[in-house]
Regions:
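C-terminal regions of RecA-like/P-loop NTPase motor modules
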Residues: 95-113, 129-137, 146
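Walker B catalytic acidic pair
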Residues: 116-118
């Protein structure tokens, strides 16, 4: 069962589901994913890396890794670096701002777009309609900084 079978286009997904999904689809299965995030890409990666590497985030922050963990981190960072993930951490205020990435989405054959915290002024149905025109599924989430 894939994401499209589980959730209809335009579904709202929790962060607890989205981050492992990004890992499974984008990194492991190499399916292109585009993410609009409302935090810096560094903050987002600081959330994703501990989950993907399965290394305690406090150990990463404090730089207290064993040699084996350093090797694992190096391997996982290489996989993450080579994954077909596109991050947009630029503030988005209109549907046209989202559409500005359409060329990349089409060229890279991106199948899944995740949008973090859709601004209230933007009509979700317009984004869903655009996704159907271009040929990708869009999912909405809210990444909180824990």
């Amino acid at each position: 069962m894939n994401l499209r079978d589980k959730f209809e286009n335009g579904s709202i997904l929790s962060e607890d589901y989205v981050l492992p999904t990004i890992i499974r689809l984008g990194i492991i299965r190499q399916i292109p994913i585009f993410l609009y995030i409302n935090m810096s890409s560094v903050q987002f990666l600081n959330k994703l890396i501990p989950i993907y590497s399965q290394i305690d985030k406090d150990k990463l922050k404090e730089n207290r890794l064993s040699p084996e963990e350093w090797n694992l981190l190096d391997q996982k960072m290489s996989e993450l670096y080579n994954a077909p993930l596109w991050l947009n951490d630029i503030e988005v205020n209109s549907v046209d701002d989202y559409k500005s990435a359409e060329e990349v989405i089409a060229k890279e054959k991106i199948k899944y777009v995740f949008i973090d915290s859709l601004p209230e002024a933007i009509d979700k149905s317009e984004i869903i309609e655009w996704s159907e025109e271009v040929g990708f599924n869009v999912y909405f989430t809210n990444f909180t900084l824990k």
